[in-house]
Each structure stands twice: as C-alpha cells, then as structure tokens.
Amino acid sequence: ALVKRLIADADIVIENFRPGIMARFGLDYDSLKDSRPGLVYCSISGFGQSGPYVHRAAYAPIVHAASGFDSVHAASQGGADSRPANWEIMVADILTGTTAFGAIQTALLGRERHGVGEHIDISMMESMMTLIPAHIQGAQMEESPVIGRFHPVKVKDGFVML
C-alpha cells in the first residue's frame, strides 16, 4: 500500500528485481499504466524482461563474462589465456545506470511531447555489449584488425601507458 501511494505521485519508477517479481506485487508497468498514463517505468535486469535468459540471475561480474568484456580485456592484457581481471569497479553497474538515465530522460521528453509515459527495459547485457562492437566485428574476420593504438607497456615495476 505504501509503495502504491508513493507511485501515485511519482513521475518515474525504477526497479531492478528479477523479471516477474513486480507483477506478483501488482507493481509492474501493466498494472500501473491505466491509473498513471504518464508514468515512466524503468525495469533493469541482467538479461532483459524477455528472452531465453530472462530468469537468470545476474550481477556485474556475471555480465562482464557473459558479454565478452572480460575476454576482450584479458586479450588486451596478455593474451586469451590470461586470467580475466578481478574488476574492482563494476563497469556493468555503472554503464547500465548511465544507459537507464539516458533512456529515462528520453522517455520524459516523449511524455512532454505526446502526453504518455512508457515502460523501458534496460538489460545489463545489452549495456555491456555497447563497449565491444569493434571486437565483435573483428572476431568475424579472417584476419582480425588491430584495434586501438594505445596499449600499456610492461616495465620493470609494472605497466606504463605511453
């Protein structure tokens, strides 16, 4: 009841439960849109609100690996056999939040122009895939092009970027 009262005055709802959880509570977009036609509702999940991986749990390190991001990074840091980095910065979380921000701002602009809100489906996986398009294309070529001109150089006490 409290959440529904909060939503009654909200312009935006952002949720990041596994797909289907909000529907169980009657708090999904389809349950709210008739009473709140201007609502901008953003669902964030690991692999999206539909599709073959919809019920897979995800957090940043899982999505780093599933998207190929870890593999691309390992290859650039010493070869495909290198152990993927143990990221201390959860790139997927940051990038997905930034992607959601842009989508929400666009939906708010659309609402100003057309008078209706919308449901936004943001997946961590899709957000991460935006980081590696050149690597994906290169993997499909017989001879993969060199991507980027700047690489860390190994020195006696670590690496330096030139």
Segments predicted by a language model, with ranges:
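Short secondary-structure junction motifs
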Residues: 22, 36, 117-119
